[in-house]
Amino acid sequence: MIELQDETTIKIKPLDLDMINPNPANFMDPNQGGSKIFIIGKSGSGKSTLIRSLFYNKSQIIPVAQAMSGTESETGFYRQFIPSAYIFDEYDSQALGNMIMRQKAARQYLANPWTMLIIDDCMDETSVFNKTPQPALFKNGRHWKMLYLVALQYALDVKPGIRSNIDGVFIFRESNVAIRKRLYDNYAGIIPTFQLFEKIMDEITKDYTALYIHNVTTSNDWRDCVFYYKAPFENQHVDQFKFGCCEYRGYGAKILKPHLK
């Protein structure tokens, strides 16, 4: 619990990752929808540690994943836990389309059809969100048994049609006032004022901790929508885990291009 001393004391609660669907209690429910989550933070802010923590948290209930990363060829980050066959070094709309077709079929025929999709540092322009298949992902993705993560280095101005379909946003430290204002306007407007948002940012986003805005709630109290989360920095289980079911990893090894083996 973090307490913010203002005119009144505001208590910010820690985030339970089970609040992000699916979770162990609902992933086998055929009517359970997925989530669209934004992760916004500069290089070195703690974003990668958070992403690994999310994959680890969901690895017992989600059997497959796909990653698109603009920095993968340099860092090899996703190859540490996702088979290389399912990783793309750039944004690939055709691969996304194929994955959507897979999800539509999986939903009909598989007991556990869930997948994770992350697009990391590949969407520098807001125009990408207007191109196929992005509008469908945000509008209908919750019906495709998908946890969709978008990781950005800075805040993009997104259209209301996209913004209203984002289920949650992780926000890491940011000192630039203009960028903070963009973060507030696009993703954190549930907090009553920009001044209060800045105070919360200053207090929470220290030491690689993220502010989390939870958009999936029935409460009218903004304090029920604001949390903080700090991923475990050095955890042997998280650092060494491998994502995916045996069939997923085995098939990935079979189809892997020779120069990537």
Curated annotation (Swiss-Prot):
Sorted alphabetically, the keyword list is: ATP-binding, Nucleotide-binding
Could you tell me which SUPFAM superfamilies the record lists for this protein?
Answer: P-loop containing nucleoside triphosphate hydrolases
Q: Which InterPro entries match?
A: P-loop_NTPase
- MF (Gene Ontology): ATP binding
Give residues annotated as binding ATP. Answer: G41, K42, S43, G44, S45, G46, K47, S48
The family line of this record is: Belongs to the IIV-6 075L family.
Q: What is this protein called?
A: Uncharacterized protein 088R
Q: What is the lineage of its organism?
A: Viruses, Varidnaviria, Bamfordvirae, Nucleocytoviricota, Megaviricetes
